[in-house]
Protein backbone atom coordinates (compact mmCIF):
# COMPACT_ATOMS: atom_id res chain seq x y z
CA UNK A 1 0.00 0.00 0.00
CA UNK A 2 1.42 3.39 -1.05
CA UNK A 3 1.86 6.01 1.67
CA UNK A 4 -0.64 8.84 1.55
CA UNK A 5 1.54 11.90 1.05
CA UNK A 6 -1.41 14.18 1.69
CA UNK A 7 -2.14 12.70 5.12
CA UNK A 8 0.29 14.93 7.08
CA UNK A 9 -1.20 18.02 5.43
CA UNK A 10 -4.74 16.86 6.19
CA UNK A 11 -3.81 16.22 9.81
CA UNK A 12 -2.20 19.66 10.07
CA UNK A 13 -5.24 21.40 8.62
CA UNK A 14 -7.51 19.42 10.94
CA UNK A 15 -5.43 20.44 13.94
CA UNK A 16 -5.46 24.09 12.90
CA UNK A 17 -9.21 23.95 12.40
CA UNK A 18 -9.68 22.46 15.85
CA UNK A 19 -7.83 25.41 17.41
CA UNK A 20 -9.68 28.05 15.37
CA UNK A 21 -12.45 29.85 17.20
CA UNK A 22 -15.03 32.46 16.40
CA UNK A 23 -14.12 35.99 17.38
CA UNK A 24 -16.62 38.82 17.49
CA UNK A 25 -15.92 42.56 17.40
CA UNK A 26 -18.65 44.80 18.77
CA UNK A 27 -18.75 48.50 17.90
CA UNK A 28 -19.63 50.96 20.64
CA UNK A 29 -17.56 53.92 19.50
CA UNK A 30 -19.12 57.33 19.97
CA UNK A 31 -17.08 59.44 17.54
CA UNK A 32 -19.28 62.03 15.86
CA UNK A 33 -20.57 61.03 12.44
CA UNK A 34 -19.71 57.34 12.73
CA UNK A 35 -21.68 55.28 10.17
CA UNK A 36 -23.17 51.83 10.61
CA UNK A 37 -20.19 49.45 10.53
CA UNK A 38 -22.05 46.17 10.08
CA UNK A 39 -20.79 45.87 6.50
CA UNK A 40 -17.25 46.02 7.90
CA UNK A 41 -18.05 42.97 10.08
CA UNK A 42 -18.45 44.89 13.31
CA UNK A 43 -21.38 43.73 15.42
CA UNK A 44 -23.78 45.72 17.56
CA UNK A 45 -24.03 45.71 21.36
CA UNK A 46 -26.72 47.35 23.46
CA UNK A 47 -24.76 49.34 26.05
CA UNK A 48 -26.68 51.04 28.86
CA UNK A 49 -25.05 53.45 31.29
CA UNK A 50 -25.68 53.66 35.02
CA UNK A 51 -27.56 56.96 34.78
CA UNK A 52 -30.41 55.16 33.02
CA UNK A 53 -30.43 52.10 35.26
CA UNK A 54 -30.22 53.63 38.73
CA UNK A 55 -32.23 56.36 40.46
CA UNK A 56 -31.92 57.97 43.91
CA UNK A 57 -33.42 55.96 46.75
CA UNK A 58 -36.77 57.66 47.55
CA UNK A 59 -36.20 56.90 51.24
CA UNK A 60 -32.72 58.37 51.17
CA UNK A 61 -31.33 55.37 53.01
CA UNK A 62 -29.33 53.76 50.24
CA UNK A 63 -26.62 56.11 49.08
CA UNK A 64 -25.87 54.06 45.94
CA UNK A 65 -29.43 54.49 44.70
CA UNK A 66 -31.89 51.80 43.61
CA UNK A 67 -32.83 50.18 40.33
CA UNK A 68 -35.02 52.31 38.07
CA UNK A 69 -37.18 49.34 37.14
CA UNK A 70 -39.62 51.26 34.95
CA UNK A 71 -36.79 52.66 32.84
CA UNK A 72 -35.01 49.31 32.74
CA UNK A 73 -38.15 47.68 31.38
CA UNK A 74 -38.42 50.35 28.68
CA UNK A 75 -34.80 49.74 27.72
CA UNK A 76 -35.29 45.99 27.67
CA UNK A 77 -38.26 46.39 25.33
CA UNK A 78 -36.18 48.71 23.16
CA UNK A 79 -33.36 46.15 22.95
CA UNK A 80 -35.83 43.55 21.69
CA UNK A 81 -37.61 45.93 19.33
CA UNK A 82 -34.31 46.98 17.75
CA UNK A 83 -33.09 43.40 17.48
CA UNK A 84 -30.22 43.28 19.96
CA UNK A 85 -28.94 40.11 21.56
CA UNK A 86 -25.78 41.14 23.42
CA UNK A 87 -26.36 43.63 26.22
CA UNK A 88 -23.75 45.27 28.43
CA UNK A 89 -24.91 47.29 31.41
CA UNK A 90 -22.49 49.74 32.99
CA UNK A 91 -23.12 50.09 36.70
CA UNK A 92 -19.80 50.98 38.30
CA UNK A 93 -20.47 53.00 41.46
CA UNK A 94 -22.13 50.09 43.27
CA UNK A 95 -18.77 48.37 43.68
CA UNK A 96 -17.24 51.29 45.57
CA UNK A 97 -17.94 52.87 48.93
CA UNK A 98 -20.31 55.83 48.90
CA UNK A 99 -20.90 58.13 51.86
CA UNK A 100 -19.68 55.44 54.21
CA UNK A 101 -21.87 52.71 52.72
CA UNK A 102 -20.63 49.58 50.95
CA UNK A 103 -23.04 47.17 49.30
CA UNK A 104 -22.54 43.54 50.27
CA UNK A 105 -21.88 40.86 47.62
CA UNK A 106 -25.36 39.45 48.28
CA UNK A 107 -26.99 42.86 47.84
CA UNK A 108 -25.13 43.31 44.57
CA UNK A 109 -26.14 39.88 43.32
CA UNK A 110 -29.80 40.41 44.24
CA UNK A 111 -30.06 43.74 42.42
CA UNK A 112 -28.19 42.60 39.33
CA UNK A 113 -30.32 39.44 39.22
CA UNK A 114 -33.44 41.60 39.23
CA UNK A 115 -32.12 43.83 36.45
CA UNK A 116 -31.10 40.84 34.34
CA UNK A 117 -34.51 39.27 34.96
CA UNK A 118 -36.31 42.31 33.56
CA UNK A 119 -34.16 42.30 30.43
CA UNK A 120 -34.77 38.57 29.91
CA UNK A 121 -38.51 38.93 30.45
CA UNK A 122 -38.78 41.57 27.74
CA UNK A 123 -36.05 40.26 25.44
CA UNK A 124 -35.80 36.44 25.48
CA UNK A 125 -32.66 36.62 23.31
CA UNK A 126 -30.83 38.75 25.88
CA UNK A 127 -27.20 37.76 26.46
CA UNK A 128 -26.32 40.10 29.30
CA UNK A 129 -23.47 41.09 31.58
CA UNK A 130 -22.10 44.18 33.32
CA UNK A 131 -18.98 46.19 32.60
CA UNK A 132 -16.05 44.94 34.66
CA UNK A 133 -17.30 41.42 35.38
CA UNK A 134 -15.83 39.50 37.12
CA UNK A 135 -12.84 41.61 38.08
CA UNK A 136 -11.45 45.11 38.35
CA UNK A 137 -9.24 46.65 35.66
CA UNK A 138 -5.89 45.02 36.52
CA UNK A 139 -3.88 47.11 34.07
CA UNK A 140 -5.37 50.28 35.55
CA UNK A 141 -4.59 49.17 39.10
CA UNK A 142 -0.99 48.60 38.00
CA UNK A 143 -0.82 52.09 36.48
CA UNK A 144 -1.70 53.73 39.79
CA UNK A 145 0.93 51.68 41.66
CA UNK A 146 4.12 52.23 39.63
CA UNK A 147 6.51 51.40 42.47
CA UNK A 148 4.65 48.39 43.88
CA UNK A 149 5.84 44.85 43.23
CA UNK A 150 3.76 42.53 41.07
CA UNK A 151 2.54 40.23 43.85
CA UNK A 152 1.22 43.18 45.84
CA UNK A 153 -0.58 44.50 42.75
CA UNK A 154 -2.18 41.11 42.11
CA UNK A 155 -3.18 40.82 45.76
CA UNK A 156 -4.88 44.24 45.60
CA UNK A 157 -6.61 43.31 42.34
CA UNK A 158 -7.97 40.08 43.83
CA UNK A 159 -9.10 41.88 46.96
CA UNK A 160 -11.07 44.62 45.19
CA UNK A 161 -12.52 42.13 42.69
CA UNK A 162 -13.75 39.62 45.25
CA UNK A 163 -17.13 41.27 45.85
CA UNK A 164 -18.01 40.94 42.16
CA UNK A 165 -17.95 37.15 42.09
CA UNK A 166 -21.61 36.43 43.05
CA UNK A 167 -22.83 38.86 40.36
CA UNK A 168 -20.39 37.49 37.79
CA UNK A 169 -21.75 34.01 38.44
CA UNK A 170 -25.24 35.03 37.27
CA UNK A 171 -24.01 37.08 34.29
CA UNK A 172 -24.24 35.41 30.88
CA UNK A 173 -20.66 36.24 29.93
CA UNK A 174 -17.52 37.77 31.38
CA UNK A 175 -17.12 41.45 30.49
CA UNK A 176 -13.65 42.54 31.70
CA UNK A 177 -11.95 45.86 30.99
CA UNK A 178 -8.73 45.77 28.98
CA UNK A 179 -8.01 49.45 28.36
CA UNK A 180 -4.28 50.08 27.91
CA UNK A 181 -2.48 52.77 29.90
CA UNK A 182 0.84 53.06 28.04
CA UNK A 183 2.60 51.76 24.89
CA UNK A 184 3.94 48.78 26.88
CA UNK A 185 2.21 45.92 25.05
CA UNK A 186 4.26 43.27 26.84
CA UNK A 187 2.88 44.20 30.26
CA UNK A 188 -0.60 44.73 28.83
CA UNK A 189 -0.64 41.22 27.37
CA UNK A 190 0.51 39.80 30.70
CA UNK A 191 -2.34 41.57 32.47
CA UNK A 192 -4.87 40.40 29.89
CA UNK A 193 -3.64 36.82 30.26
CA UNK A 194 -3.77 37.02 34.06
CA UNK A 195 -7.36 38.27 33.99
CA UNK A 196 -8.42 35.68 31.41
CA UNK A 197 -6.75 32.82 33.27
CA UNK A 198 -8.61 33.89 36.41
CA UNK A 199 -11.92 33.87 34.55
CA UNK A 200 -11.25 30.45 33.06
CA UNK A 201 -10.44 29.10 36.51
CA UNK A 202 -13.50 30.52 38.25
CA UNK A 203 -16.03 30.58 35.40
CA UNK A 204 -14.81 28.01 32.87
CA UNK A 205 -17.97 28.00 30.77
CA UNK A 206 -18.36 31.73 30.26
CA UNK A 207 -17.49 33.52 27.04
CA UNK A 208 -15.10 36.43 27.52
CA UNK A 209 -15.88 39.72 25.78
CA UNK A 210 -13.50 42.48 26.88
CA UNK A 211 -13.63 46.24 26.52
CA UNK A 212 -10.85 47.92 24.52
CA UNK A 213 -10.48 51.56 23.47
CA UNK A 214 -8.64 53.07 20.46
CA UNK A 215 -7.18 55.63 22.87
CA UNK A 216 -5.01 55.25 25.93
CA UNK A 217 -6.84 54.95 29.23
CA UNK A 218 -8.13 58.21 30.73
CA UNK A 219 -5.92 58.20 33.82
CA UNK A 220 -5.40 61.89 34.58
CA UNK A 221 -1.83 61.29 35.76
CA UNK A 222 -0.83 59.53 32.55
CA UNK A 223 1.41 61.20 29.92
CA UNK A 224 -0.58 59.20 27.34
CA UNK A 225 -3.99 60.37 28.60
CA UNK A 226 -6.55 59.69 25.83
CA UNK A 227 -4.01 59.90 23.03
CA UNK A 228 -4.83 57.69 20.05
CA UNK A 229 -3.01 54.36 19.94
CA UNK A 230 -0.89 54.00 16.81
CA UNK A 231 -2.39 51.60 14.22
CA UNK A 232 0.43 49.03 14.44
CA UNK A 233 0.02 48.71 18.19
CA UNK A 234 -3.79 48.66 17.84
CA UNK A 235 -3.58 45.78 15.37
CA UNK A 236 -1.44 43.87 17.87
CA UNK A 237 -3.99 44.55 20.60
CA UNK A 238 -6.67 42.98 18.44
CA UNK A 239 -4.45 39.97 17.79
CA UNK A 240 -3.73 39.55 21.50
CA UNK A 241 -7.42 39.91 22.30
CA UNK A 242 -8.26 37.20 19.77
CA UNK A 243 -5.60 34.95 21.28
CA UNK A 244 -7.15 35.05 24.75
CA UNK A 245 -10.81 36.04 24.44
CA UNK A 246 -13.98 35.37 22.47
CA UNK A 247 -14.56 38.95 21.46
CA UNK A 248 -14.14 42.64 22.22
CA UNK A 249 -16.30 45.71 22.57
CA UNK A 250 -14.50 48.64 20.94
CA UNK A 251 -15.65 51.57 23.04
CA UNK A 252 -14.97 55.28 22.94
CA UNK A 253 -16.38 58.57 24.04
CA UNK A 254 -16.31 61.64 21.76
CA UNK A 255 -13.16 63.44 22.93
CA UNK A 256 -9.39 63.31 22.59
CA UNK A 257 -6.54 64.20 24.96
CA UNK A 258 -7.21 67.91 24.46
CA UNK A 259 -10.92 67.54 25.22
CA UNK A 260 -11.71 68.21 21.56
CA UNK A 261 -14.60 66.49 19.79
CA UNK A 262 -13.39 63.71 17.48
CA UNK A 263 -15.23 63.29 14.20
CA UNK A 264 -15.34 60.05 12.28
CA UNK A 265 -13.28 61.44 9.40
CA UNK A 266 -10.43 62.33 11.78
CA UNK A 267 -7.21 60.74 10.41
CA UNK A 268 -6.49 59.17 13.80
CA UNK A 269 -9.67 57.11 13.94
CA UNK A 270 -9.43 56.34 10.23
CA UNK A 271 -5.97 54.86 10.86
CA UNK A 272 -7.49 52.79 13.67
CA UNK A 273 -10.23 51.54 11.38
CA UNK A 274 -7.79 50.69 8.60
CA UNK A 275 -5.85 48.51 11.06
CA UNK A 276 -9.10 46.97 12.31
CA UNK A 277 -10.21 46.16 8.78
CA UNK A 278 -6.83 44.59 8.00
CA UNK A 279 -7.16 42.42 11.10
CA UNK A 280 -10.67 41.36 10.10
CA UNK A 281 -9.54 40.56 6.55
CA UNK A 282 -6.64 38.45 7.85
CA UNK A 283 -9.01 36.50 10.12
CA UNK A 284 -12.11 36.56 7.93
CA UNK A 285 -13.06 32.92 8.45
CA UNK A 286 -13.12 33.33 12.23
CA UNK A 287 -14.84 36.71 12.51
CA UNK A 288 -18.42 36.21 13.63
CA UNK A 289 -20.96 38.92 12.90
CA UNK A 290 -23.97 39.28 15.17
CA UNK A 291 -26.65 41.15 13.29
CA UNK A 292 -29.83 42.68 14.60
CA UNK A 293 -32.88 40.43 14.60
CA UNK A 294 -35.91 42.68 14.76
CA UNK A 295 -39.29 41.42 15.90
List where the protein language model places each region.
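Hydrophobic h-region of N-terminal signal peptides that target proteins for export
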Residues: 11-19
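Boundary/entry segment of secreted carbohydrate-active catalytic domains
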Residues: 20-62
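Glycoside hydrolase catalytic-domain groove-lining segments
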Residues: 179-219
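Substrate-binding cleft of secreted/luminal carbohydrate-active enzymes
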Residues: 212-215, 219-294
Amino acid sequence: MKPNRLLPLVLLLTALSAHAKDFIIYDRMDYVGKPDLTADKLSKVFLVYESELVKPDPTGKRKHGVLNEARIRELAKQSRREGYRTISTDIESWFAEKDGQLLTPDELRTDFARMYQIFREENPRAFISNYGMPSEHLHGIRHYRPNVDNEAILAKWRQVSKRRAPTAAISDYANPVFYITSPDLVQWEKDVKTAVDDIHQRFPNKKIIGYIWPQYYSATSSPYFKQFIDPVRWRKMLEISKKYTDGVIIWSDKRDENNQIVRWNDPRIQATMKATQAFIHANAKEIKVEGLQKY
